[in-house]
Amino acid sequence: MIPIVVNPHPNKEFYVGDKTDKPTPSGSGVNVLYFTNKCNLACTYCYEDLPGRPPQIMTKEEISKFIDDIFARENPNNQTLIVLFGGEATLEWENVCYAMEYAYSKKLNVHFNLTTNGIKYLSQNFIDETVNNFFYKKRMLSIDISFDGIGNGDRVFHGGKDSTSAMIQVLTNLVKNNVRYRIRYTIQKNNIDNWYQDSIHIIKTFKPLRFITSVAWDTLDPAEDFSKLESAKELFRKDWFAGDLKVPVCELFCDVCNGCGERKELKTYFTNEGNVTTYGNYENTPKFHDFKEKIQ
């Protein structure tokens, strides 16, 4: 049983990402490219609220322009981070590869982060294509797989089928092929009661390089659930300091973990409509509205 630690406002201080002396270059950003608003899953808590909306897919011309805009804002002497996102970015893999190639042709000091639900990695051919990618081989491409463990029942296919067995196969495939990857885990109502134990099990079983957490705050009960976040956080930190946990749980250890070289000042988002959202990296995330309401 996890001991109860009371914190009335965990959403304001749950993470410690801003409690570090790492440099924060002016104008630097977590630069997110939404290649498409379409996805091969239909997660029940998805913030994008896309059913019935027409496709929004970036063209190569738009991709080039947005990357030029990002480079114009950022210091040319610092590394630029570009997040390859959706929807499901792997559904637009040709454009994803184009974005990496175009960005690299303009600036060598760049890193790409592919954020994906992982379903495409059921295919050995797609695994082979990824590990043979120039940027993956140069360690310029990191891969984040979304998986919610015991709460994964909310991550369903469009027909309503639970994706958990498919995701276990995906993670097994990645481990078998020695793919470098990280897991993104959303803490929500269906895993909050056991998210510490669940996370430790996932880390030990599937061996990600990092375990990156986010919180679906709207699904939690402040009176009952917020203390569970804080209690588990303290257990993770205890394990980290004791040396029992070697995989960083982001962003719970940023004050003591040297895994990242710098912090980013901004989060900036691009869809096919342009730079739709920009806000401070450690501000509370505003309600998602980047794909505007449309009539087909």
Question: Where are the language model's segments positioned?
Answer:
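N-terminal [4Fe-4S]-dependent radical SAM core
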Residues: 1-32, 76-77
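Accessory C-terminal segments flanking Radical SAM cores
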Residues: 2-4, 244-296
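N-terminal charged/capping segments associated with class I S-adenosyl-L-methionine
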Residues: 9-13, 17, 22, 47-52, ...
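Canonical Radical SAM [4Fe-4S] cluster-binding loop centered on the CxxxCxxC motif
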Residues: 23-62
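Radical SAM/AdoMet-radical enzyme domain recognition
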Residues: 64-83, 92-218
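Active-site neighborhood of divalent metal-dependent phosphoester/pyrophosphate hydrolases
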Residues: 86-87
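Flexible glycine/acidic-rich beta-alpha junction loops that bind and position SAM and/or redox cofactors
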Residues: 155, 190, 209-230, 248-260, ...
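Iron-sulfur-associated redox domains of electron-transfer enzymes in respiratory
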Residues: 182-187, 198-202, 216-241, 258, ...
